[in-house]
Amino acid sequence: MKGDADADAPRRADSSRAGDGDSLHSPPMIDRDAVRDNAKYLRNVRPVDPDEIADYIEGAPHPAVVKQTLREEAHDLGLFERDDGTFVPANADPAPVRNWSPAAFPDDYSFALEDLLIGRYGANWHVGESGDRLRERVRQLKEDYYRGNPVEYDEDAALGYAIYHLPDYYAAVGYVLSDLAERSLLPRNPRVLDVGAGTGGPALGLHDYLPDDSVVDYHAVEPSASADVLDRMLGETRRNFRTTVHRETAEAFAPDGEYDIVLFASVLSELDDPAAVVRKYLDALAADGAVVAIAPADRNTSIGLREVEREVAPADGDVTVYSPALRLWDGYAPSDRGWSFDVRPDLDVPGFQRRLDEGRAGDEDEGTFVNVDVQYSYSVLRTDGERRLDVRGNPARFAKMAEMERHVTNRIDLLAVKLSHDLSEGNNQVFKIGDGSEAVDHYAVRTRDTVLNADVADADYGDVLVFENVLSLWNDDEGAYNLVVDDETLVDRVA
């Protein structure tokens, strides 16, 4: 009698293998379950070879058909395709945190975009009628975003959008993913849904942030002409980054299964009911997954993102704000204006932006069509209760921003999240801060620089700070509270 392992081992089929021509031009139907079963067995024994599996499948399909089937099933099976065409168990460790600080938009992606531009307009795409048309599309996109108008994407608008936004969107997503990776909460092999994927900047940033040995099942939802650009840009990704583009609206698309990351990058402001859409996709989130929402730093889109966050994650609800705007007091949610954004180092100007900018009108400033500032608002939401920093206020120790009115002119101790870079235009540094209970804006104003209060300046966006002996004042001109950090104030970064 054979042992259990032998009983489960693959069996060779009797029929001969289909010829090359038949398999490549008219691929036979393949027993997908048999491919999966054989792969599950072999993965524990040796590298999974499509040539070998083909011998075990009824009808002996061509190895190329088996390989394609394995690629389609690789994420579910936890298999990584090697350069030699065989498949091995994927590394299941979380994605490591990266020192993400890109200096430039990668050349391979720049060349891919320029290929599209040359294919549509010719080698001199940036001059003449085509250049004028692209510049007009960029002007209109910027105006529509500023005014909050509906944004329409034809082929010219999609390419103009790609020229202007691919680099900064590429950079921004990596910084946001670091919030998850630093706590080992970013899967190395995620299933990703990119809602409103646009022309692919966030997808490419995600691709480059994850390690080379990751196995990714990436799905994009993009109904506009931007999907054509997205398709071309995704062609630059590695073989284990499997991509599918769904040309449907966010409202119409029906998620299939669960996703580890649901990404909304610069799309919430374009939806009629963004909170309802986010709620819909929260239902498709894995139990330990994250919704990652990113928006441009301008006032309207930034505040709009925070409004969505607050609507889908009310105080004591089932959705937790993981970062950056932590709620430090249980039972409270903020209701201030909510304009808050991070600032990272600028990118080098890519050649395609420089060329488009050189053809600007005489009355336009240099750099009108250059966009290398990396400034963005974001929100990471989870349903498992995880937070980037598990810090909460103690009423016996700290004042609460919800009750700041009664502390005016007093020195207090305060626990707060740093929610901006230096906003000052004068001598005193100014930083937006919050504790998740605030109804109006609060700002830390550093009037005296000391070693003991340096953390207010040195801390990163999203860090939690303890302020000791900070002076609370009301700023009537700004309609906000100023927390004065002077030589009597101690500021410590909690984490």
Regions found by a protein language model. Name each.
Residues G148-R183:
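Class I SAM-dependent methyltransferase Rossmann-like catalytic core
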Residues A361-A495:
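C-terminal lobe and adjacent flexible extensions of AdoMet/dcAdoMet transferase-like proteins
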Residues T199-D213:
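Conserved SAM-binding loop of SAM-dependent methyltransferases across substrates and taxa
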Residues D288-P296:
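Conserved beta-strand signature within the Rossmann-like core of class I S-adenosyl-L-methionine
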Residues V48-R147:
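N-terminal auxiliary segments of SAM/dcSAM-dependent transferases
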Residues S226-D256:
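S-adenosyl-L-methionine
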Residues P187-G198:
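Conserved class I S-adenosyl-L-methionine
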